[in-house]
């Protein structure tokens, strides 16, 4: 009897539990149907235009299973918000950003080395080291088929064409080109992005520029990397760049806004700098340094003839006439020597533009204009020369010697004069802003004279 009672109780418990489970399932189904109907009434159901559009675009994306899973999860979250709420807008913008990024999309490289060399030589005069390095990279890429991009840093004085070289490299390889200026960057979030919990959150500038390029392997110029502010109240941007510029890490770059990893390993990063001393050592170690030195006068003349003068003639509207203005070699040399003081050609370009503007003004007034610009016309076009170089014309004066000086804009000569005065101490007085080496040279010269005065 006791066993029979236990069996009946067990059957009753099973029957009760089964009924409860069925009731719970029916309740969940009923609630799900209610939620679905309410969403459809509000225009936010699975059939809403916004969701359909996002799902359609997502189906075409070439992304990994992890990213697809994250996208679906975030897409489901969208249904939880009211379309009029700020949260809905934030979530929708995030999903649009994910859709807009070129996940796994690469432009096909043109690895014709002769064509690339021709483009680089046409666009830029000199810069043999840089051109050689880019062509080597293309050659290895052609042989291997797959290669992590090098991280190159071009350093040198302003105006030598470091930034513009990036466009030529992109054209030579048929890649997209993007440029990001780092001058004055003081917030780490500019690199890594803001977390979505913040109002007005957005991805970092690295991800935004990749989105702008529409390709995951563009030529990416990081301009003025030596001007990045370090150790600020908003973090250290130079430390944030370590992940971007490390070939071992940038295959999984983490942006705070996206909150998923993005592959930057195929991006050809080219940084530019004027002074390496202001770049942190860990950042320098991750980059391949290539010096772009200043130009000598002969090189500047060639650059002016090939690039600057034709471009400025077009900018000033003087290319529409049959007779275009021409500069003689001596005229260009005079502009370089007496109107500019630089390693690059930026000031030279400005002076050429100024001269051509004067010619355009005279033409507009129907005045007579000499189309051939010689050294004699330069002062009339550019005004009085602000710089004059010392010229060695022989030296027969006792107590005057010629010295050689090195400056950032090239070599100089200088005249060092001495004079004797009566006295018992034999004191040496130096004038001018001299460095320690110059002072030591003067002391050695005096001691030499003392040692050999009686011989």
Predicted regions and their residues:
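Extended, charged alpha-helical coiled-coil/arm scaffolds that mediate oligomerization and mechanical coupling
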Residues: 1-144
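Conserved C-terminal "switch" segment of AAA+ ATPases
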Residues: 61-69, 104-106, 214, 275-353, ...
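Pre-Walker A (Motif I) flank of P-loop NTPase domains
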Residues: 146-152, 216-218, 267, 426
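Walker A/P-loop
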Residues: 148-182, 211, 242, 246
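AAA+/P-loop NTPase substrate/partner-engagement loops
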Residues: 172-202, 209, 229, 299
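AAA+/SF3 P-loop NTPase mechanochemical coupling elements
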Residues: 213-218, 253-272, 326
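Conserved catalytic/switch belt of AAA+ P-loop NTPases
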Residues: 222-262, 266
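Conserved P-loop NTPase/AAA+ ATPase motor core
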Residues: 351-455
């Amino acid at each position: 009897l006791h066993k029979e009672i236990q069996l009946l109780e067990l059957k009753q418990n099973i029957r009760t539990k089964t009924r409860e489970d069925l009731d719970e399932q029916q309740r969940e189904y009923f609630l799900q149907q209610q939620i679905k109907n309410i969403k459809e009434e509000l225009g936010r159901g699975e059939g809403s235009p916004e969701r359909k559009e996002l799902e359609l675009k997502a189906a075409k994306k070439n992304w990994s299973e992890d990213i697809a899973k994250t996208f679906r999860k975030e897409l489901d979250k969208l249904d939880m918000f009211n379309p009029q709420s700020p949260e809905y807008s934030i979530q929708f913008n995030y999903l649009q950003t994910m859709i807009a990024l070129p996940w796994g999309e690469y432009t096909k490289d043109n690895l014709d080395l002769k064509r690339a060399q021709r483009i680089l030589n046409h666009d830029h005069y000199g810069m043999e080291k840089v051109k050689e390095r880019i062509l080597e990279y293309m050659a290895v890429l052609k042989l291997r088929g797959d290669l992590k991009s090098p991280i190159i840093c071009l350093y040198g004085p302003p105006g030598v064409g470091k930034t513009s070289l990036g466009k030529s490299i992109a054209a030579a390889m048929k890649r997209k080109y993007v440029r990001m200026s780092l001058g004055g960057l003081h917030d780490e979030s500019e690199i890594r992005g803001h977390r979505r919990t913040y109002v007005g959150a957005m991805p970092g500038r690295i991800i935004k520029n990749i989105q702008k390029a529409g390709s995951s392997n563009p030529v990416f110029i990081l301009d003025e990397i030596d001007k990045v502010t370090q150790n600020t109240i908003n973090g250290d941007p130079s430390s944030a760049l370590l992940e971007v510029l490390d070939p071992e890490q940038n295959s999984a770059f983490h942006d705070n806004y996206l909150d998923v990893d993005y592959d930057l390993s195929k991006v050809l990063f080219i940084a530019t700098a004027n002074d390496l001393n202001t770049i942190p050592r860990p950042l320098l170690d991750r980059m391949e340094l290539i010096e772009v030195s200043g130009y000598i006068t002969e090189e500047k003349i060639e650059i002016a003839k090939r690039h600057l003068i034709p471009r400025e003639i077009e900018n000033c509207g003087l290319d529409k006439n049959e007779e275009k203005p021409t500069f003689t070699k001596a005229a260009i040399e005079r502009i370089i020597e007496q109107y500019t003081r630089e390693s690059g050609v930026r000031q030279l370009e400005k002076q050429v533009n100024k001269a051509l503007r004067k010619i355009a003004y005279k033409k507009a007034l129907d005045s007579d204009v000499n189309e051939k610009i010689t050294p004699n016309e330069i002062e009339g076009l550019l005004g009085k020369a602000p710089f004059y170089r010392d010229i060695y014309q022989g030296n027969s004066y006792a107590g005057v010697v010629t010295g050689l000086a090195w400056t950032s804009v090239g070599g100089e000569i200088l005249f060092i004069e001495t004079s004797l005065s009566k006295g018992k101490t034999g004191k040496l007085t130096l004038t001018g802003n001299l460095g320690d080496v110059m002072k030591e040279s003067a002391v050695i010269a005096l001691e030499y004279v003392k040692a050999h005065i009686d011989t």
